[in-house]
Each structure stands twice: as structure tokens, then as C-alpha cells.
Regions:
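Internal intein/HINT superfamily modules and their associated LAGLIDADG
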Residues: 1-103
Length: 103
């Protein structure tokens, strides 16, 4: 369950922790993927909305096959937004995890 004040808590540092924990780099599409499989659609939509409103980072949702009907979503940040993500959070990412943002 996400806190009601998530938008005020969702800082570049918090975003970096989300990527370090649940993120991956898709080489074929040069995009960042957030594996939010245990979040509900409402929660994932909230995260997506915060990324857009606070950081101007667009994304799109994909339902994973064979997942629970209420959960099992991934959020994909397309290549056109990767440079924004890197600029925003690269200082907060552990060096050994920078591969998750394609660095």
C-alpha cells in the first residue's frame, strides 16, 4: 500500500531506490523497466502519474502474462526519457547498479 502523500515523498533519491530495487535495463529497446508486479493497477497508475507530473517522465504500462488479475504490472520508460532519468538520479545510484539505467 502506497502512502497518501507519496507525491511529496517521491524525490529523485526515492526514484533511484525504486530503480535500484525493481528496475532493469532493456538493451533491445534502450529503455528502463520497473517491475512493479506486487502493486495494484491503481498504485502503478499513481507512480506513473507522479513520474509525469513531478519529473516530466512519460511511461507506459504492460500487464505481465500469467499474473494475478489485480497485480502484475511493469512500467516501461521509453528511450526518449532515459536521458531525463539519468540526469535526475545518476548521482544517487550505486556505481554497481548503474547498469539498470544503461550506464
Amino acid at each position: 500500500m502506497l502512502p497518501l502523500n507519496l507525491d511529496s515523498l517521491f524525490t529523485p533519491l526515492a526514484f533511484a531506490f525504486l530503480i535500484m530495487g525493481d528496475g532493469s535495463w532493456d538493451k533491445s529497446g534502450s529503455r528502463i523497466i520497473l517491475h512493479l508486479n506486487n502493486f495494484t493497477l491503481i498504485e502503478v497508475n499513481r507512480i506513473q502519474s507522479i513520474l509525469l507530473s513531478k519529473f516530466d517522465i512519460s511511461s507506459y504500462l504492460v500487464k505481465t502474462p500469467h499474473s494475478d488479475k489485480d497485480r502484475g504490472y511493469i512500467l516501461k520508460i521509453p528511450a526518449r526519457n532515459v536521458s531525463k532519468v539519468r540526469e535526475l538520479i545518476s548521482d544517487h545510484i550505486y556505481p554497481t547498479l548503474k547498469y539498470k539505467i544503461g550506464l
